[in-house]
C-alpha cells in the first residue's frame, strides 16, 4: 500500500508528516511518498525524508492518481479530487458542514474521505484527535500573540523603580484551546479569569489557578462529544451583559468559543470593545469560523478605539514544527489502528465507532449521518 503526503498550500506553514513519522509508517510495511520540498517551511530537506524511508515525488498529479491513501492537513481543491484514483482513501481536515460541494465531489469520485474534525471524542480515539492537538497549540500561540501585541508585561514585577502590576487576562470558552490559554497565561504570570457556558468546567479552571466568572444565563447543555450547544438569543444577551464589566477590566481578552458544525457565536460586541481600556488586546480564535468578536478580520490586526483586535486563522501554524509533529502522530495512530499487517492494507469497517464517526464518503455515497443531515 502506498501513502502520499502532498505539500500544503502556500499559506500553510505546517506539514502533514515529519521524517520521524515516515519511519514509523515504513516500519509497518507501508510505502511512503512525499512531495518534493514538503518540509521547506520547516527547513527540513528531502534528503532527511529519504533517509527515513520516504520516496520523493516530483510529479504531484501522478502521485495523486496512483496512491492508495492521501494524507494532508487542509482540504483539497475540488479540481484536485478528480485526479485521485477511485476507491482510494483521502484523510485531512475537510470542514464538511461548510463544504458540501467538496463532500459531494468525493462521493462522485468514489473516494473514501475521512474528516479529521469528526474523530469522535472518546477515550479510544484521543490519540487520533487532531482537532484537540491543534487547538491545544492554538491556545498557547494565542497567549504568546497577545503578549507581543500588548504594551504591558504579563507578570507582576517588584523593582527599585516601583511595582508593576500583573496583566489581567480574560479567557472566554474553556475547551481544549481555552484551557491551554489559561495555563500559558498563568505560567507567564498573568492574573487570569475565564468563562464558559458549561458550569461543569469550573473545577478545571480553578485547578489551573484561574478564577471562574459566574454569569447566570439559565440552563445550558453540551453535546455528547463535550461541545457547548448553541445558546438562545436571550442567553447570548445575558452572557454579553455579564462579560462587559470583566472585559472592561481586562488587558487581554481571548475568545475560543465554537459550536460544533455551526458558525461561531458572536460574543464580544462593539459596545463591549468600546468599554475596554485603550491599549487592550483581543485575540479572536474563532475568526476562521465567523468570529466571536465584532470587527475582527481574518489574518489582520484591527485597532478600534485604541483596542487591538487580532484575528488569526491559523494559530497552530505559529508553532508549526510542534503542530506538524502532533498532527503527523494523529495520522499515524489512525492508520496504525486499522492497519492489517498480513494483507498490507487498511481494514475499513464502517461499523467501527471511530470510522463511523469520521468517514464522510465511501463507495460513492455520503455515509456520515451528521453530514447527511445538513444536506
Predicted regions and their residues:
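Rossmann-fold NAD(P)-binding glycine/threonine-rich loop
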Residues: 97-123, 262-316
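Glycine/threonine-rich flexible loop motifs
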Residues: 12-16, 79-83, 92, 226, ...
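Adenosine-phosphate binding glycine-rich loop
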Residues: 117-118, 123-160, 287, 293-375
